[in-house]
Amino acid sequence: MSTRRIFGLETEYGITCAAPPGQQGLSADEVARYLFRKVVAWGRSSNVFLRNGSRLYLDVGSHPEYATAECDDIRQLITYDRGGERILEGLVADAQQRLELEGVPGTIHLFKNNTDSAGNSYGCHENYLVRRQGDFTRLADILVPFLITRQVLTGAGKILTTPAGATFCLSQRADHIWESVSSATTRSRPIINTRDEPHADAELYRRLHVIVGDSSMAEPTAMLKVGATDMVLRMIEAGVPMRDMALENPMRAIREISHDMTGKAPITLASGRTVTAVDLQQEYLVKVRDFVESTGEVSDTDRKVFDLWERGLLALQSGDLTSVERELDWVIKHRLVRRYQEKHSLELSDPRIARLDLAYHDISRTEGLYNLLAARGLVERVTSDVEVLESTAVPPQTTRARLRGEFVRRAQEAKRDYTVDWVHLKLNDQAQRTVLCKDPFQSVDERVDRLIESM
């Protein structure tokens, strides 16, 4: 049985323009226009596919969104996700320069987080290609309790201000999720979005669209988030029986888990059993590890995921988080917050703490707190700077993204008018030649070669 899967991450970014005291800052719409000016200039649109096979566009609510090219390896996926940050950082530099030329005050910041000060939420959507065979309801039933409880390890952390005061939560998205499974993404915000757009052969595949997760700054957190989910899916697809872990009230559970830093908040299952998020994650870990090891197909990434999954749960059980304080986002952030609080004798509700929370997610390599920690070697990495830089210009070589990226590059170099999406490559000439690429695993295609040669 092949464990190869297509993955993709879509990340919506928060955007702001900090104006000097006493001056009116630009609105998010205005900042977005400056940010995408260069993109619109060459792409004639604020929705474009890039030479690296990825998609860059302006989403509703003026959120820049970057969707990685199709990846078939988790390390590759994280590399292309980080590459998106670098591409957007370049757009920020260009927009900043334009502001200064026009005498407009303010500094543009992009945040890879999931909530803004007005209480709006925007997402990090995970995409997993799954086989069409099998019961989707069963898949969702097994996956939802896993996705609700994984936040104890994969949450990005957040200072939540309530009428009762400020509190540190595990997840940024948890308070904004209202359903387990739905076809909407904004109105009801489900854990799993069921809108069926496989971007592949619909008879063979469907695209599982998970929208409950937090955006990850820490690369090992991203690896665990996607890697553990991938292995749970492998087990489900193989038909392995799983004890019923359905939650009595999933929406209450997701919030109660997020608001309890110990991972030990009691949650009630539909069966009446009372457990904790750590208990359920431990159950998934044991079951998944037994299954994956029994297949004999354990990759290096699988081993790293199991190691961090296990160490994270042990750390929560013991209350000593030092073993994961360089790898898990919320733990890294909580440590920063605690030290800053102690140094300056601050309450958690102090606005300076909220600014620190935000600065952790700033994608700037000179101002973002996470990136400054990474530059000083204070957090663990999965990728390298060289690979991330390469990913901004070169598509993954093992998936359909290679065909798209190469087509875009050659069409741009030949100054040809073209249209592309996830499955179509089209030259907008008299012949209107189009190639349909339905197989996301296919990186070589004679039809695409001929289309490129015809330029």
UniProtKB/Swiss-Prot annotation:
InterPro entries: Pup_ligase, Pup_ligase/deamidase. One of its GO terms (biological process) is modification-dependent protein catabolic process. Mg(2+) binds at E10, Y57, E65. It holds the Pfam family Pup_ligase. Its EC number is 6.3.1.19. Coiled coil: none annotated. ATP binds at R55, T68, W422. It is an enzyme of class 6 (ligase). PANTHER family: PUP DEAMIDASE/DEPUPYLASE, PUP--PROTEIN LIGASE. Catalyzes the covalent attachment of the prokaryotic ubiquitin-like protein modifier Pup to the proteasomal substrate proteins, thereby targeting them for proteasomal degradation. This tagging system is termed pupylation. The ligation reaction involves the side-chain carboxylate of the C-terminal glutamate of Pup and the side-chain amino group of a substrate lysine. This is Pup--protein ligase. The gene is pafA.
